[in-house]
A protein has these predicted regions:
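Long, distal/terminal scaffolding or interaction modules
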Residues: 3-293
Length: 293
């Protein structure tokens, strides 16, 4: 409705402002003002509608277990999304029992691997993955497993992974990119190093980082707990000395039990070298970890 716009009085007060021509900006263009072309996200040729969902459809409908194995590539940006939607539509927020629908994938995953995965859906990927892994995670389980021990030292999950996650579990057997777990409100995640701006605006959940973090860690974090195993605790505290962050030791048995449980699950799913080393000397875990709230 550009017909409701008019020149501001501020644009007549000075010689330069008065010279600005705004007529072409507020001219009402001719033509329809409703949508003329339907959006087409090409889901009909995507991975989920052609492979995972058809394979798992009857198991979802009947609540039975299903396991499938697939090779995927970085052009497929819907892995697990349609299947997860089908679970949520039929079973609502409760979803299915854990690991009911279990998909093994391998290769170079595209964006949004296992996005919005609900409870009952597990995606176990061996390889690497682009941005937005597990974004909006809603109760499901996501595993990104390095294909070999050398890859554990590299970035195998892209930027903005687990953005807005609310529930669920994730195990990343390598490093992740920037803005990891921002706006996480309830997911429990293990990763082996992250880039800048990690855990921004986090409000809930638990994140264990078996390695170093980038700059601006925990900015705006107002809830949840993270346990960091940096190469140097002293350096970590120095670099990340924000007024909004509180550092402390892990003193209570309940906390140690939680860390051990998450690391055991991480090792079970990924055979992580770092997790194994920490578990082998877990009686001294307080010396290697810093709690951040």
């Amino acid at each position: 409705r550009t017909d409701l716009l008019q020149r501001s009085s501020k644009l007549t007060s000075g010689s330069k402002a008065a010279a600005i021509q705004i007529e072409n900006l507020i001219e009402q263009s001719e033509g329809p003002n409703t949508k003329q072309i339907m959006q087409d996200h090409h889901l009909d040729i995507g991975f989920d509608l052609n492979y995972l969902y058809p394979d798992a459809k009857h198991s979802i409908q009947n609540g039975h277990s299903f396991t499938g194995s697939y090779v995927i590539n970085n052009e497929q940006r819907d892995v697990g999304v349609i299947t997860g939607s089908a679970i949520a539509r039929q079973y609502g927020e409760k979803g299915l029992p854990e690991d009911t629908i279990f998909a093994y994938t391998e290769g170079h995953a595209g964006q949004s691997l296992a996005a919005y995965a609900p409870h009952g859906l597990t995606i176990h990927h061996t390889g690497d993955a682009n941005d937005y892994v597990g974004k909006g995670l809603s109760g499901g389980t996501v595993i990104v497993n390095a294909p070999n021990e050398e890859r554990e030292q590299e970035i195998i999950a892209g930027n903005v992974s687990f953005y807005g996650a609310s529930r669920g579990k994730a195990y990343i057997n390598g490093k992740a990119g920037e803005r990891f777990c921002i706006r996480n409100s309830g997911a429990d995640v293990v990763v082996e190093g992250i880039g800048d701006h990690g855990l921004e605006y986090m409000t809930g959940g638990h994140v264990i980082i078996l390695g170093d973090v980038g700059k601006n860690f925990g900015q705006g974090m107002s809830g949840g707990v993270s346990y960091i195993f940096p190469s140097s605790i002293e350096e970590f505290k120095k670099v990340n000395a924000l007024e909004t962050l509180e550092f402390s030791e892990v003193r209570y048995d309940e906390e140690k039990a939680l860390i051990k449980e998450m690391l055991e699950a991480h090792y079970k799913h990924t055979r992580s070298t770092k997790a194994r080393q920490i578990l082998n000397q877990f009686e001294n875990v307080s010396q290697y970890v810093v709690k951040v709230i």
